[in-house]
């Protein structure tokens, strides 16, 4: 009853906000039961994209998704809206009663707080059975994340694009210092030894052996650790496993002269020998510096978890509870995940959940920036499994994992245990505040 009452109160707030001002973020309350989706033609499918961010360009969406749907479903008209400010955020659509049929969004960051908390989620398990869709053909790590959104293993969506990571390396720096290039399947210990050899100061140039975004490293850690307790409303970082993860990265930072800057300067400054970044940087680094002599290999892994990629950084497709076209929506999603269409998306540099040999071979074929690059590195090993599902009803909070390193380790020289404990305590307080605010809203709603 509390949740139902909260829906009405949040919807009213959303309407008043929409009428009165521009809203700063895509946060909103659940859909009101008396605010049904606006009627639309039976052959129109409303797709709302938040991630991938490049779907803000309609021509990219049309090329990768729109044309695919038109080819398979010629009688279907696609209405596409991409998250934007103002007027195109979750709360705006909810307030207007224009609920999408399919939402494509970042699973780790947004599904709990925007889709589930807004009561837009829908268990598609029956549709999977009805259309005999084989989920086992998809990347197991990505499907595990789909199932782990619910402690009962309900499936609210299917993966679309995994924005995965690789290790970039500057061949010229390796050649300059006579060091052999890295190879697929190397461990952090091996990469650390390379980083020490490649970190040097020559005149006014500081060559950095290794760089890494600490937030990405922590959030998508390869040991499948969760920063949140799976059973209680609190953070959970004071463990030997988390210390192991932190100690592993901080040793790179503590190599003299190898203090991390940002991986984004890999191409522009060209003084970083190795850097972990998302695969799409193959294109962006090339465009930033067409003379950059670089290639990629698989991300380093822990010696006791060899050949393990990062946890899923996946953007997934979700059918909304409010959609009146769930069957059509699912058939469209299934068509997108067919090998034929996965190959076409892979050619455009989309890391798709289907990892058959034809898909791997097709990756990046339509992108001249990827020609000659070791794109097989993207598929080396297996995706790390995501953490298990949390208990029902727990507050979701995006623990600022990057703060363990910046500023606590990088600027304040905290030891690993202290840095982890400080972020754990700060996050637990924020979770308590968020929980109290929710309880206040529940009380207000119950009085209506």
Question: Where are these predicted regions, by residue range?
Answer:
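Mature extracytoplasmic/periplasmic domains
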Residues: 39, 283, 319-394, 418
């Amino acid at each position: 009853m509390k949740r139902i009452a909260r829906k009405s109160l949040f919807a009213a707030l959303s309407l008043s906000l929409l009428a009165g001002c521009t809203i700063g973020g895509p946060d909103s309350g659940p859909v009101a039961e008396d605010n049904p989706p606006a009627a639309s033609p039976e052959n129109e499918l409303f797709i709302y994209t938040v991630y991938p961010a490049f779907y803000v360009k309609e021509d990219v969406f049309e090329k990768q998704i729109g044309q695919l749907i038109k080819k398979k479903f010629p009688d279907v008209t696609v209405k596409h809206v991409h998250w934007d400010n103002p007027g195109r955020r979750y709360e705006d659509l909810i307030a207007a009663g224009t609920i999408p049929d399919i939402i494509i969004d970042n699973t780790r960051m947004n599904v709990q707080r925007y889709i589930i908390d807004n009561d837009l989620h829908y268990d598609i398990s029956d549709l999977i059975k009805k259309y005999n869709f084989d989920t086992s053909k998809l990347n197991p790590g990505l499907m595990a994340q789909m199932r782990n959104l619910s402690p009962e293993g309900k499936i609210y969506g299917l993966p679309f694009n995994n924005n995965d990571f690789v290790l970039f390396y500057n061949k010229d720096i390796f050649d300059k210092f006579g060091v052999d290039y890295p190879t697929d399947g190397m461990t952090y210990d091996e990469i650390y030894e390379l980083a020490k050899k490649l970190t040097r100061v020559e005149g006014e140039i500081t060559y950095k052996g290794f760089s890494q975004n600490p937030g990405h490293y922590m959030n998508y850690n390869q040991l499948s650790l969760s920063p949140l307790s799976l059973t209680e409303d609190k953070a959970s970082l004071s463990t030997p496993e988390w210390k192991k993860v932190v100690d592993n990265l901080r040793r790179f930072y503590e190599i003299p002269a190898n203090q991390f800057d940002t991986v984004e300067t890999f191409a522009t400054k060209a003084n970083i020998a190795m850097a972990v970044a998302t695969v799409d940087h193959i294109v962006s680094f090339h465009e930033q510096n067409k003379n950059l002599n670089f290639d990629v290999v698989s991300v380093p892994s822990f010696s006791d978890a060899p050949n393990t990629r990062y946890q899923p950084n996946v953007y997934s497709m979700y059918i909304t509870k409010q959609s009146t076209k769930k069957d059509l929506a699912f058939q469209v999603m299934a068509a997108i995940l067919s090998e034929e269409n996965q190959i076409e998306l892979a050619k455009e540099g989309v890391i798709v959940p289907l990892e058959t040999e034809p898909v791997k071979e097709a990756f990046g074929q339509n992108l001249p920036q990827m020609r000659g690059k070791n794109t097989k590195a993207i598929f080396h090993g297996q995706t790390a499994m995501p953490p298990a599902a949390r208990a029902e009803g727990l507050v979701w909070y995006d623990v600022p994992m990057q703060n363990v390193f910046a500023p606590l380790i990088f600027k304040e020289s905290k030891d690993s245990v202290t840095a982890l404990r400080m972020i754990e305590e700060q996050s637990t307080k924020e979770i308590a505040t968020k929980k109290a605010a929710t309880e206040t809203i529940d009380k207000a709603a119950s009085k209506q």
